[in-house]
């Protein structure tokens, strides 16, 4: 086996009041896919920022091919062959594919950009990536997330990156795009590159990776140089510091009367009329590939988009919602897929994010904010939902994804909400926080609320839901009871015929 090409030696990173990394030491080999695992806040992202020159370590050294380095900025790291493919892509949406691929090294001729050469180089790399059908002149904003990710990888290859790190790369990809990414990662390994792979998906670790390093609370817990003898439960135990027998923790409960009925609803992204019921106490899943119409259907229900036909009956009363605000007042709340841009106010505090929807309840004489009541309400939900935050005044964008999701849920608990629509509720969330989110959803169902979970995670929908509606190409093709919802059956229904 080859010697370590990349080595972290006693890396520590400190911020005011927080030790993000605490003397982390481990190594990765050339020609290896090395998984980095841990709960949100465990230190994985901070480590990648040290590697890429975004954060400078307080102590310790980084060794690459036997030479010590401390990068002052991202440009230095890039010059030494390091590329990071972040979960939030760094492409310029209004530039073309070719311009994004060669940004910083655009070919010139007589002082001008040589566009013919630029497009030719872009075509070569696109062919290498299996994306030869993409026109190099296409604006990046017109590509799918999976295609954009391939452009990021292509940019790394054009810079001859020897170390490529992926941060939750499959969190927004379709099944087909995920397969393509796995092929590319295998190719990078076969070419002798170091591939660091951050993921919360256990199946990806065992399918794709050669080694795994586990982090917890900023510390290196263990590096497994081989996955032989390693199983799901052992990894989870190392990540959370305790044994979790069942992440999903399904809780059977009584299912009540019909809470909401969808009759012949159709609109943008929903190509045929949909008929669907949600009952009190029920967790109903909506599964399908990216673009299948799951989120689009719920956007029609919640008043985000206008339906072209059909209606919604809530508690037996037919309703037409012209806006999400009307839906919320009626008792329907949606927690969106994109938490950062649609679910939270990122620079506002945890308290402000918790209270934003119910501020009308905390007024003096109907006009002025009652700060003390808002603080009490925030502290109540922080404790009730076990939100990990230094203070109710902490900016929400400093919290992990799981804790941000709890804040969004807590916001609606203060309202009189009967139906909770959760769009990809555990995307990018670690295993411990996932269990907490599932427990909260079961709590809501046991209180007689209705819960709809939109998810592209087969294991999730088949494990936590009482029934699963499967959508394909804007059509609800079947509704499968939990007892019959094997992953093979659900995927078979979701894939194109």
UniProtKB/Swiss-Prot annotation:
Protein name from the UniProt record: Arabinose import ATP-binding protein AraG
Family affiliation: Belongs to the ABC transporter superfamily. Arabinose importer (TC 3.A.1.2.2) family.
Subcellular location: Cell inner membrane
Protein topology in the membrane: Peripheral membrane protein
InterPro entries per record: AAA+_ATPase, ABC_carbohydrate_import_ATPase, ABC_transporter-like_ATP-bd, ABC_transporter-like_CS, P-loop_NTPase
GO molecular function: ABC-type L-arabinose transporter activity; ATP binding; ATP hydrolysis activity
ABC transporter domain mapped to chain residues: 6-242, 250-497
Keywords recorded for this protein, A-Z: ATP-binding, Cell inner membrane, Cell membrane, Membrane, Nucleotide-binding, Repeat, Sugar transport, Translocase, Transport
Naturally occurring in which organism (per UniProt): Chromohalobacter salexigens (strain ATCC BAA-138 / DSM 3043 / CIP 106854 / NCIMB 13768 / 1H11)
GO cellular component terms attached to this protein's record: plasma membrane
Gene for this chain: araG
């Amino acid at each position: 086996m080859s010697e370590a090409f990349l080595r972290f030696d006693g890396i520590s990173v400190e911020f005011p009041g927080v030790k993000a990394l605490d003397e982390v030491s481990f190594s990765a080999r050339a020609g290896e896919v090395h998984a980095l695992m841990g709960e949100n806040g465990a230190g994985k992202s901070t480590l990648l920022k040290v590697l890429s020159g975004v954060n400078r370590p307080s102590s310790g050294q980084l060794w690459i091919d036997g030479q010590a380095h401390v990068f002052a900025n991202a440009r230095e790291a890039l010059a030494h062959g390091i590329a990071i493919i972040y979960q939030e892509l760094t492409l310029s949406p209004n530039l073309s594919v070719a311009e994004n691929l060669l940004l910083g090294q655009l070919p010139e001729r007589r002082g001008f950009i040589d566009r013919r050469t630029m497009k030719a180089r872009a075509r070569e790399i696109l062919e290498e990536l299996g994306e030869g059908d993409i026109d190099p002149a296409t604006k990046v904003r017109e590509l799918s997330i999976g295609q954009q990710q391939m452009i990021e990888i292509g940019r790394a290859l054009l810079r001859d990156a020897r170390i490529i790190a992926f941060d939750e790369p499959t969190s927004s990809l379709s099944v087909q795009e995920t397969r393509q990414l796995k092929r590319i990662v295998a190719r990078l390994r076969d070419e002798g590159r170091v591939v660091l792979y951050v993921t919360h998906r256990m199946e990806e670790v065992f399918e794709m990776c050669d080694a795994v390093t586990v982090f917890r609370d900023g510390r290196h817990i263990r590096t497994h140089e081989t996955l032989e003898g390693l199983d799901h439960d052992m990894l989870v135990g190392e990540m959370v510091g305790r044994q979790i027998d069942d992440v999903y923790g399904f809780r059977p409960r009584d299912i009540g009367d019909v809470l909401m009925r969808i009759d012949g609803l159709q609109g943008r992204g929903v190509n045929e009329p949909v008929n669907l019921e949600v009952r009190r106490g029920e967790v109903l899943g909506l599964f399908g590939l990216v673009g299948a119409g799951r989120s689009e259907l719920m956007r029609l229900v919640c008043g985000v988009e206008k339906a072209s036909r059909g209606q919604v009956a809530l508690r037996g009363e037919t309703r037409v919602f012209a806006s999400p605000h009307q839906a919320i007042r009626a008792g329907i709340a949606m927690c969106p897929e994109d938490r950062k841009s649609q679910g939270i106010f990122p620079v506002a505090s945890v308290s402000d994010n918790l209270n934003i929807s119910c501020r009308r309840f905390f007024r003096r004489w109907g006009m002025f904010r009652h700060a003390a009541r808002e603080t009490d309400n925030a502290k109540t939900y922080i404790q009730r939902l076990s939100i990990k935050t230094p203070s109710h005044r902490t900016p929400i964008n400093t919290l992990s994804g799981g804790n941000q999701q709890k804040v969004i849920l807590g916001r609606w608990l203060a309202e009189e909400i009967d139906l909770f629509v959760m769009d990809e509720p555990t995307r990018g969330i670690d295993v411990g926080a996932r269990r907490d989110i599932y427990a909260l959803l079961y709590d809501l169902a046991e209180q007689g609320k209705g819960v709809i979970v939109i998810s592209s995670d087969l294991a999730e929908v088949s494990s936590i839901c009482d029934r699963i509606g499967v959508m394909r190409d804007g059509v609800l093709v079947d509704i499968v009871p939990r007892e019959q919802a094997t992953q093979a059956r659900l995927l078979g229904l979701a894939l194109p015929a």
